[in-house]
Amino acid sequence: MSDVSGRFVVAAAVVAVSLAMAAAAAAHDYGEALSKSLLYFEAQRSGRLPYNQRVRWRGHSGLTDGLEQGVDLVGGYYDAGDHVKFGLPMAFTVTMLSWSVLEYGEEIAAAGELGHALHAIKWGTDYFIKAHTHPNVLWTQVGDGDSDHYCWQRPEDMTTSRHAYKVDAENPGSEVAAETAAAMAAASIVFRRAGDAHYAHLLLHHAQQLFEFGDKYRGRYDESVEVVKNYYPSSSGYKDELLWAALWLHRATGRREYLDYAVDNADDFGGTGWAVSEFSWDIKYAGLQVLASKLLVEEKHLSSQQREVLEKYRSKAEYYVCSCMGRNPGGAAHNAGRTPAGLLFIRPWNNLQYVSNAAFLLTVYSDVLSYLSLPLLCPDPDAAADEAAPAAADAGEVLEFARSQADYILGTNPMATSYLVGYGEAYPRRVHHRAASSASYARDRDFIGCLQGFDSWYSAAAENPHDLVGAVVGGPNGNDVFTDHRGAYMQTEACTYNTAPMVGVFSRLMELERRRRGEDAPPSSTSPVAEDDL
């Protein structure tokens, strides 16, 4: 059974795991965190803002994007605290938002946030439809990172280059084509479930074309669009994105050809070979390994070969989970780093992106373990082939670890600081973000020049005029220390792909808390959202 015939229903075993975690549950308001996370995406919007825009200190921006190239590229998201629209991280953001809704849509609906979640996804997919102007053409970037970083302006005042860049048959970009295909395929399932069959079909049509384009004309996108190399280079190549997109297309269509692609190319493309400790906009292996593992739960008519290969994917998914939890034999070489207070620590620059992605994958994988009634296994690579690996953790422990990472983000940390802006009493007040750090365009329309903003806003010791509510910033250093200063951009800049996976995590934990308190599910509606509202 594929996602075509219905969503993956969390089994009774998952409920039992949730109840068993009652004693360890934290006193955080995950519903509030969820609501604020979704609000953040409205602050990152580019283009003509809708009448129901909730972040009122933002205005229309980028209204001539694509004009120079004769294509309409108005819309989409700014990735972080600047104003370039980077296609690869934007697509990954939409994929993770969609996956969050697919896994925990009922919980999101119960919180009254399903409409906002669909809006957030559609703001991205509407842009991707515009950017995919031909079966073998995808516009992947608007703006220039170098000139953009030279200025500190509100997006409404931009004077920097809005040159647009594309990939095509002569200048391929398999990573961005495949990731955009994955995003549109995942979103198509979301909107089909929401009752918008026409829009779902349109997204799926684009997703299939983009996958075919990325697979037929293979090449690294940062070699075709070289200006992206200083910002979003591809370190893992494009094979992980191709496998990732194929699995999403299988879930969206139920067609065997996409599953066969992921099975037949599993070894050659590294899907069953790469054992990793990170999941990000660049390196998709852990994500596709968890996604493949879910097929063992959802698919009822797998061939023996398919099941064998999917089990290989699952073994690598377990390596990732074991690495995050520090359970892999072999010490530091096989396990993700930690701060003294227990936060996963992969890199100093924007470390919380890796934490939020890990929290999401571990949350999803704990549900897989519950359904299969299996423990987490962390085998010793030096053990004999016939030596069974001991159980390293159960599903409840995996979910508990994911919760610990979410709670750290929400303020259970040595700094007693929430790294989700706007949550709690103490949170970053000087986020590295041009719009949030400047006067509201809605109240003060006096033009802010390119360099003027550095003197007036960037260098100021004062707090930002606007809280970037719902943003997950880069986070503390390896010693759990955080510096709340705009110049400390490795720690204070937030990105869309930091927050996107937390939508799913907060939704799952919100439901966990409800069960802990023994409450009935609140009345909710998963009925279709009116097309006019989207």
Curated annotation (Swiss-Prot):
Gene3D superfamilies to which the protein is assigned, alphabetical: 1.50.10.10
GO CC annotation: extracellular region
Pfam family, one: Glyco_hydro_9
InterPro entries: 6-hairpin_glycosidase_sf, 6hp_glycosidase-like_sf, Glyco_hydro_9, Glyco_hydro_9_His_AS
Chemical reaction(s) catalysed: Endohydrolysis of (1->4)-beta-D-glucosidic linkages in cellulose, lichenin and cereal beta-D-glucans
Residues annotated as signal peptide: 1-27
Region Disordered, residue ranges: 515-534
Subcellular location, record wording: Secreted
SUPFAM superfamilies: Six-hairpin glycosidases (SSF48208)
EC assignment: 3.2.1.4
Keywords assigned: Carbohydrate metabolism, Cell wall biogenesis/degradation, Cellulose degradation, Glycosidase, Hydrolase, Polysaccharide degradation, Secreted, Signal
UniProt main location, coarse: secreted
GO biological process: cell wall organization; cellulose catabolic process
Active site: 82, 432, 484, 493
GO molecular function: cellulase activity
Enzyme class: hydrolase
Family to which this protein belongs: Belongs to the glycosyl hydrolase 9 (cellulase E) family.
Matching PANTHER family: ENDO-1,4-BETA-GLUCANASE
Name of the protein this chain belongs to: Endoglucanase 5
Organism: Oryza sativa subsp. japonica (Rice)
Lineage of origin: Eukaryota, Viridiplantae, Streptophyta, Embryophyta, Tracheophyta
